[in-house]
């Protein structure tokens, strides 16, 4: 997600008195061409300039590159010299926007160091202190929006700053220009790669300056920005497994680091105007504490993140803009993906047009040789990893105001292949490449269009809206599940799998964030009126905090779901799953492929219902709420109706019956052991029958999705509290009783085949009940009720315990009796053991990962959304 950087001014002047100009340069054509030009950026000449005349011995043979700050490049020594203009009376050279990132990546999704990854944008000030130049980051988390110098000084002196680097000033010429060796700033671990590798469990790493250098050929100078690249090497004696899988020599990881300095944009009367954040509108904020706020107002201040769009005619309802937004697509994306990306990104043109901006948004290919790290480009990068991974959108944001200066999007290339795998499981690989509505490639291209639009939406300042799927397909900022219909003949219909274009929420969110009102308009009142109208038309907004936690409460906020009725939608997806499994066979992989690969294709089909299951789970102990503001007329929070909760509970329990979990023998017969050099991977079910496929392990993983979801401690606590306040709502006791009865009842009507599946479910239920009883984060009321359920269940199973039978003790017990004896012993051990540590409890096998099929990485640098928050 975009960073929540907080802001204050560094020197004792009003916040709005920062002096800067718009950083808007036409894109340059070349990267690595070795030729300087006005557009390209100056690569320098070897002649003598003003500084060279003052210091002929130091600059002889060096390349001078004029720009935002003049630089001299010494190819012989590998050094970069920064030439500074005269300082002011406080010693300040100037303030700039600083951005760092990595041009090249490690290529491992769990590690998280991806090609084109950027970090936070920071305001930095260059100032002279004695004989040293300090590069200092002001503490922009705290500030005073005031014209009073004393007020500003009080805030400035109350909080620490951060000096990021210091260098010796080696010589001062008579005119006041100074030089400093800037090499050590450029050749350092600015992206904190060593810490990130350690955090990812890849061992201890150190930066090796002896194998690192500034890349002169790809360091550019422009009037509004400086771009520096350095080749950096990191070393380790014990590299982790993920590095061994991706680096050619695991003990050395070499990356290209990119650092940018930008002229600060103008703000205030003739520049960018921040817009106040509203939690109902779906924009990302920057946040700060304003110590000059009146006593009757909060000091917490939030402004939205957005690009600057200025109308040529500010008074016109519709007008062209001074500087249109141009997004450049990575030409490294192959066709037909490239065209799909361009089409999906171009959908945003409609939103800006409806917000009153004519031709304000367009999409082009990145010019040949141009660097995607150049801060002048809004870019959509196509990034490869060794395994499928996240996509995310963000960019360079001015932390003082929220103005977005560059949109930067990363799209994982294996995402579309995972989509194709999903649809080959549903439709069959024989349809691949046919061009028909059920062609997995065509369906996947439809999804990649939405993914591109989604991530660019983040880079325009928009958050996820996970409620949009409940009122139509209303937003690309949701995570869209494919809509698979069922024909009257019982076949699967993919013709409406994904929507095309933006939804109603997207159009509103851009209009609210970007509309420029005519002079004299009460902006606050106008924006509030827009929100009231949107709410009246059913456009609600719920985001990550409401959707992602396993114990989340609002059934409207769900990832990868469809429809306004979670229960009915779950039943539909279970029927889609049943039809898909009934037709599953050799045709689900391409001719000539090993049949063993059907195991990977089976996983997303067998777990097809997993996200709609999450939607139904949120109905149980669910709470309907919105981001209401006082006076906006939205209703207060209310628990979900009891009948709806009970219907959802029934639908959830239906997903873990033996009939739902069983796989047909013809399918199991095709799931062959792995051939030579086809190693098991995380896309397969956990296996306890190796080398044979483990259908009982798959059943345990699928059942656990439901059981673990029901027994989340937050959901259990809500059930206790909601029932306390309204006896018509189901309580935790009712849910626990239903779970136990459905798991331990019905054996008389089952075949031996089905009974074994039920015993798998019983073990999952007992393990999860024990885990919740010992969960120290669960409330005492929850733990007491769960422990009571376990004691009652042990009593129910007790007749099967050893010693309860009068038959010959050498006679084997039947499987049901053995199971009950085993589970009773498990419960006894758990309840009576003195060290009730949940971490020591064995858990059911985890299902293979559903995500990443979107954004949300395990690790994301500040400044990116992600989309662990998503695509």
Language model feature labels by segment:
Residues 1-11:
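Bacterial N-terminal signal peptides that target proteins for export
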Residues 9-21:
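Bacterial N-terminal signal peptides
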Residues 26-333, 351, 360, 365-418, ...:
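Auxiliary tRNA-acceptor-end handling modules of aminoacyl-tRNA synthetases
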Residues 30, 51, 365-384, 446-502:
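The catalytic-center signature of Zn2+-dependent metalloproteases
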Residues 339-346, 350, 446, 450, ...:
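Solvent-exposed, polar/charged alpha-helical surfaces in well-ordered, non-transmembrane soluble domains
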Residues 346-357, 385, 457-458, 482, ...:
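Sec-exported extracytoplasmic/periplasmic mature domains
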Residues 403-407, 452, 457-460, 510:
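Extended catalytic-interface subdomain
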Residues 471-871:
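Conserved catalytic/binding loops enriched for acidic/polar residues
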